[in-house]
């Protein structure tokens, strides 16, 4: 078998998430259906680097799959891209060794989260950013975001019900900025892995800090206490983007 690595992007609005689910539309299923046609009716399993949730978007999701023979990567990319639905784009495909695994090979993920703050809101962006109508302090959020950088136990920023036992992760970069063109707040996080709804919980906490309803020290309090109840709310997934995955 020959292994292929593909970088894909997608608009997550009409998907239940990346992972295949019964009676629901998923990115994995759509790509597997297309590969089934390209592979003469033989099923192909797609493995993703990240299992994005319903409504979450991606610019740089990475997948891998195996085919029984070697094909020209660009021709394969073109065939897969043109036969996938319009809300999925196959950015690139390359041949990789059998040891490569999209999820388990060592990598750094970067997520971005967009917030349309203030009034009036932009209804055209309702599927691509969350609206937050209250005043925000960029300086306070930037200061609090720096507290997330480093290796920590992120239990307090994880959604309940996760089956992952080891909740220690390393965040190498965390920032908050304002996009000059849109005026949206951009929350960016890079790290070696993220827990279930971790990014959305961190953004919810930073928004409360930016609005003055939590102190900057709340981030440290949540990390040390590992108490989810002390963090901010889970923001909606439509503002979240899997921006990039870099492999070592």
UniProtKB/Swiss-Prot annotation:
Pfam families (UniProt xref): PseudoU_synth_1
Record keyword Lyase present: no
Family that this chain belongs to: Belongs to the tRNA pseudouridine synthase TruA family.
Tree of life domain: Bacteria
Assembly mode: Homodimer.
Enzyme class: isomerase
Keywords: Isomerase, tRNA processing
Residues reported to bind substrate: 111
Gene3D superfamilies from the UniProt entry: Pseudouridine synthase I, catalytic domain, C-terminal subdomain (3.30.70.660), Pseudouridine synthase I, catalytic domain, N-terminal subdomain (3.30.70.580)
Key word Cell wall biogenesis/degradation present: no
InterPro entries in UniProt: PsdUridine_synth_cat_dom_sf (IPR020103), PsdUridine_synth_TruA (IPR001406), PsdUridine_synth_TruA_a/b_dom (IPR020097), PsdUridine_synth_TruA_C (IPR020095), TruA/RsuA/RluB/E/F_N (IPR020094)
The protein's Enzyme Commission number: 5.4.99.12
GO MF annotations, alphabetized: RNA binding; tRNA pseudouridine(38-40) synthase activity
Function: Formation of pseudouridine at positions 38, 39 and 40 in the anticodon stem and loop of transfer RNAs.
Gene Ontology BP term (one): tRNA pseudouridine synthesis
NCBIfam families linked: hisT_truA
Reaction it catalyzes: uridine(38/39/40) in tRNA = pseudouridine(38/39/40) in tRNA
Protein name per its UniProtKB record: tRNA pseudouridine synthase A
Active site residues per record: 53
């Amino acid at each position: 078998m020959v292994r292929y690595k593909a970088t894909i992007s997608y608009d997550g609005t009409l998907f239940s998430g990346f992972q295949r689910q019964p009676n629901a539309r998923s990115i994995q299923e759509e790509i597997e259906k297309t590969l089934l046609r390209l592979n003469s009716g033989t099923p192909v399993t797609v493995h993703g680097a990240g299992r994005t949730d319903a409504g979450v978007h991606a610019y740089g999701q990475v997948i891998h799959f195996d085919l029984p023979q070697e094909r020209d990567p660009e021709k394969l990319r073109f065939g897969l891209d043109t036969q996938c639905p319009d809300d999925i784009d196959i950015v690139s495909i390359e041949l990789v060794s059998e040891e490569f695994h999209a999820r388990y090979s060592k990598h750094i993920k970067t997520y971005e989260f967009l917030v349309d703050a203030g009034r009036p809101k932009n209804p055209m962006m309702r599927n691509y950013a969350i609206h937050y109508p209250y005043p925000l302090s960029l300086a306070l959020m930037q200061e609090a975001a720096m507290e997330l950088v480093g290796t920590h136990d992120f239990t307090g920023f994880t959604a309940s019900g996760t089956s992952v036992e080891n909740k220690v992760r390393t965040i190498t970069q965390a920032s908050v900025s304002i996009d000059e063109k849109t005026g949206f707040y951009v929350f960016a996080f890079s790290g070696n892995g993220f827990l279930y709804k971790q990014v959305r919980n961190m953004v919810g906490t930073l928004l409360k800090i930016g609005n003055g309803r939590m102190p900057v020290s709340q981030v440290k309090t949540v990390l040390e206490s590992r108490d989810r109840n002390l963090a901010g709310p889970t923001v909606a997934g439509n503002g979240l983007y899997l921006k990039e995955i870099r492999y070592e």
